[in-house]
């Protein structure tokens, strides 16, 4: 459309039908110009012409709001701010990558790959230092976007992602799948980061530490208008879910990236296919050399097996693909002074020495603290207070002391002495044989461990106190209403109305849930105690083996190792826990408060038809809760594992079963669906 034509149209008495046609044409034109500018890097109109088209569309949409379309470029910034982010379950897990920190690591990865599938080529790309994002298009229109989160569940950031101008609200052309999930990195270019901090400096506001933090903070704004002002960018690096399955995709990773680009999605210009190992190392060195000149922050390069069929043969491990690796750049290093050491107590009782450093700028941030990990690390470094140390940001994230500078040690340097008593509760600090970490023996008595211990105690898989969420626990402890788990059972509804946003009705419901939680099982009770390395399965095995708490309390390490799946280390943790007077006092107080469970009867052989078998659950179960299914299988004698191996007897495959199903089929493991599982349970009631 020419400017003069637009002027005439806007000044005329336009009919609704004409307005709708013009608005659709303007939206399509502006979206295409966005792609030409941000993706193709080949704009065909000036900025002023683009602005003129946009203003025309804005005026028409104000006059005819009923014709605003979802992919209109005016809809990039939403209306009201959100109260919170909703959760989104990924259709396909967003896995992380394993790391290589040098040629030896990458060569070992290369050997593992070629041993499995023969010769390979790699699609190489910069590892952007931003935030992983999943974007779902349905019928070509952006439907939703989410953060990686824990890989299974992320946060809904759709409105914020729409503000990123390089991301098309509607895919280009018509040749795309009905559903396509695009994965990539949202990041803040260096120039945008500098401009953002300049604006903050002018307003005397807190500065962002680095572009990655700025990008993450910008994407997690509840008000998308703030995100829109931050000039974020995006590069696509992979496809996720594609429907229908029959849609013809490229046979290589590089070809699939070109498909994404043809649909209007931005893809890095630094991507290269390397056929030989030497070419991979040359690519790495080239990007490393040009790192400071690139318009965005990177912390390495990503190497992916280019052939999709080879990727599928290689498959996945629990948290990462076997066909890709992040080849990280060497961390940046600086020297500074160790001014002192503080000892922190973590939620599991781990006592960790933390170095207090003279502040130093390294790897893009100012570092004033670094973990010294444990006594062995202090001894290995030979470090003393007053030493000059070399600080590195390992992986460009975690500050780490890697060495001392002996020639700079002053005569006043002093030894680092580990405390004999917990700096929080005064209990003895102990270090079990074979363990690197020293721990406070206070257990449930220690204030540093108290909040997390009580959160765990009340959690769904433990005593399952409905309504007792993390924030409620924190308030109960902060207001000194609860000091130990047993105090939960002394709470009344009127006491809990002291909590924020807790009316009498909610408090009465919570009091009822606390009362109901007194009736539990021995397995749940043991899990709730938070004994180190005692998960649900181990707690169930301990309960089944000893049948009573009294028998378990006096069990020796030797007796404990006779329990299924309990090794020496776990046995030591259990014995150590029950040897601490503080912990026994808490247990006795819980029983005195009314916590109880039914007696355990030894199961007959007929009642455990799956004894000795290993089962695995995968995918979504529609009629059964995953934990209930697991518990029923264990009742029938099965061991329920988290991964498929040659020792797996049966896999239960729910909807959207992924890599576990593929591996089971590859190994010839028996596979059943949810209906068959329900039938099994019904037959053994």
Curated annotation (Swiss-Prot):
UniProtKB keywords: DNA damage, DNA repair, DNA replication, Ligase, Magnesium, Manganese, Metal-binding, NAD, Zinc
User: Where does the BRCT domain start and stop, copy by copy?
Assistant: 605-685
> Pfam families of this UniProt entry?
BRCT, DNA_ligase_aden, DNA_ligase_OB, DNA_ligase_ZBD, HHH_2
Q: Which cofactor does it need?
A: Mg(2+); Mn(2+)
Binding locations of Zn(2+): 422, 425, 440, 446
Identify a single GO molecular function assigned to this protein.
metal ion binding
What is the enzyme's class at the highest EC level? ligase
Key word DNA damage present: yes
Q: Which residues form the active site?
A: 127
Q: Which PROSITE patterns match?
A: BRCT, DNA_LIGASE_N1, DNA_LIGASE_N2
- Quote the record's binding site residues for NAD(+): 47-51, 96-97, 125, 148, 185, 304, 328
Q: Which family does it belong to?
A: Belongs to the NAD-dependent DNA ligase family. LigA subfamily.
Protein name, entry field: DNA ligase
């Amino acid at each position: 459309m020419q400017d003069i034509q637009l002027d005439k149209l806007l000044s005329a008495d336009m009919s609704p039908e004409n307005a709708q046609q013009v608005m659709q044409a303007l939206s399509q034109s502006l979206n295409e110009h966005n792609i030409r500018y941000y993706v193709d890097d080949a704009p065909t109109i000036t900025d002023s012409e683009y602005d003129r088209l946009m203003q025309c569309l804005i005026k028409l949409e104000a006059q005819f709001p009923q014709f605003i379309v979802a992919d209109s470029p005016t809809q990039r910034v939403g209306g009201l701010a959100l109260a919170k982010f909703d959760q989104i379950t990924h259709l396909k897990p967003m896995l992380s990558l394993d790391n290589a920190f040098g040629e030896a690591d990458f060569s070992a990865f290369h050997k593992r790959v070629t041993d499995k599938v023969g010769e390979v080529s790699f699609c190489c790309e910069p590892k952007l230092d931003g935030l992983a994002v999943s974007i779902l298009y349905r019928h070509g229109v952006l439907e939703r976007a989410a953060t990686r989160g824990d890989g299974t569940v992320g946060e809904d950031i759709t409105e914020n992602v729409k503000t990123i101008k390089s991301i098309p609200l509607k895919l280009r052309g018509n040749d795309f799948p009905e559903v396509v999930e695009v994965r990539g990195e949202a990041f803040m270019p260096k120039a945008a980061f500098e401009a953002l901090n300049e604006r903050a400096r002018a307003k005397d506001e807190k500065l962002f530490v680095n572009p990655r933090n700025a990008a993450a903070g910008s994407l997690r704004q509840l008000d998308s208008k703030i995100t829109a002002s931050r000039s974020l960018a995006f590069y696509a690096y992979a496809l996720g879910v594609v429907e229908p399955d029959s849609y013809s995709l490229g046979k290589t990773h590089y070809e699939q990236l070109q498909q994404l680009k043809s649909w209007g999605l931005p893809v890095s210009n630094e991507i290269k296919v390397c056929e030989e190992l030497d070419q991979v190392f040359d690519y790495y060195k080239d990007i490393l050399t040009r790192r400071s000149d690139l318009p965005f922050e990177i912390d390495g390069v990503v190497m992916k097996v280019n052939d999709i069929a080879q990727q599928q043969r290689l498959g996945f491990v629990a948290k990462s693909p076997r066909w890709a690796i992040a080849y990280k750049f060497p961390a940046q290093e600086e020297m500074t002074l160790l001014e002192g050491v503080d000892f922190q107590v973590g939620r599991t009782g781990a006592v960790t020495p933390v170095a207090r450093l003279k502040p130093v700028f390294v790897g893009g941030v100012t570092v004033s603290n670094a973990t010294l990990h444990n006594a062995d690390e202090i001894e290995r470094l030979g470090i003393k207070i007053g030493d000059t140390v070399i600080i590195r940001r390992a992986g460009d994230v975690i500050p780490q002391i890697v060495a001392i500078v002996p020639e700079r040690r002053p005569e006043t340097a002093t030894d680092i002495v580990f405390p004999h008593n917990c700096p929080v509760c005064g209990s003895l600090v102990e270090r079990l044989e074979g363990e690197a970490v020293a721990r406070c023996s206070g257990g449930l008595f220690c204030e540093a461990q108290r909040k997390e211990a009580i959160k765990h105690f009340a959690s769904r898989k433990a005593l399952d106190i409905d309504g007792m969420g993390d924030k409620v626990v924190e308030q109960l402890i902060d207001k000194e209403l609860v000091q130990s788990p047993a105090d939960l059972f002394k709470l009344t509804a009127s006491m809990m109305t002291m909590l924020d946003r807790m009316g009498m009705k909610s408090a009465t419901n919570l009091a009822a849930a606390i009362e109901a939680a007194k009736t539990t099982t021995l397995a749940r009770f043991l899990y709730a105690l938070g004994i180190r390395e005692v998960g649900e399965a181990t707690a169930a095995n301990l309960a089944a083996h000893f049948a009573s708490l009294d028998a378990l309390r006096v069990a020796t390490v030797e007796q404990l190792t006779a329990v299924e799946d309990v090794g020496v280390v776990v046995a030591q943790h259990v014995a150590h826990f029950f040897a601490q007077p503080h912990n026994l006092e808490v247990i006795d107080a819980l029983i005195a408060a009314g916590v109880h469970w039914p007696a355990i009867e030894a199961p007959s052989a007929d009642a455990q038809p799956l004894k000795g078998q290993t089962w695995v659950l995968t995918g979504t179960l529609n009629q059964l809760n995953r934990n209930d299914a697991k518990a029923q299988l264990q009742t029938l004698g099965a061991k329920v594992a988290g991964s498929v191996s040659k020792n797996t007897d049966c896999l239960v495959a729910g909807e959207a079963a992924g890599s576990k199903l593929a591996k089971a089929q590859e190994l010839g493991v028996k596979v059943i669906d949810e209906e068959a599982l329900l039938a099994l349970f019904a037959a053994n009631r």
